[in-house]
UniProtKB/Swiss-Prot annotation:
It comes from Crocosphaera subtropica (strain ATCC 51142 / BH68). It holds the Pfam family RuvX. GO terms for cellular component: cytosol. Keywords: Cytoplasm, Hydrolase, Nuclease, Ribosome biogenesis. Signal peptide: none annotated. GO terms for molecular function: nuclease activity. This is Putative pre-16S rRNA nuclease. The keyword Glycoprotein does not apply. InterPro entries: RNaseH-like_sf, YqgF, YqgF/RNaseH-like_dom, YqgF/RNaseH-like_dom_sf. It is found in: Cytoplasm. The lineage of its organism: Bacteria, Bacillati, Cyanobacteriota, Cyanophyceae, Oscillatoriophycideae. It comes from the Bacteria.
């Protein structure tokens, strides 16, 4: 299997959860949470991670509506993703991220690590779930 270096992003209005994967493409790990201030600052922070980790691809969670349609929030994420792809000169792939934040909160609560004041941890774990889903789908398609 070829080496892969991807970042998983959970893009929100206030924060971006960021996850990375090991070179084998087996395991996603939460890296950081970016507090959003402006697009140039978002790019600057992500650019540092892209260079450090030699990223080849961005995997971005797309918040489809529960009925499977692309709603207002998903369109905002797509617009941001296209700008980010251009700025970082990286391809993007989307993955359905419905309920990843709920899954992240449930996981943290089960580990007694959840705090409604630490939304950054939820965003980072949601990004990890997004990237892990993509890695699992990719691996399954190669079998």
């Amino acid at each position: 299997m070829e080496r892969i270096s991807a970042l998983g992003l959970d893009v929100g209005k206030k924060r971006i959860g960021v996850a990375g994967c090991d070179g084998t493409g087996l395991i996603a790990t939460g890296l950081t949470t970016i507090e959003r201030q402006s697009f140039p600052q978002d790019v600057q922070q992500l650019e540092a991670l892209v260079k450090e980790r030699e990223v080849q691809l961005l995997v971005i969670g797309l918040p489809y509506s529960m009925d499977g349609t692309i709603g207002f929030q998903a369109k905002k994420v797509q617009k941001f993703a296209k700008r980010l792809s251009t700025a970082l000169e990286l391809p993007i792939e989307y993955i359905d991220e419905r309920l990843t934040s709920v899954e992240a909160e449930t996981h943290l609560k089960s580990q007694k690590k959840y705090s409604r004041y630490n939304k950054g941890l939820v965003d980072r774990l949601a990004a990890t779930i997004i990237l892990q889903q993509w890695l699992d789908q990719r691996r399954a398609s190669l079998i």
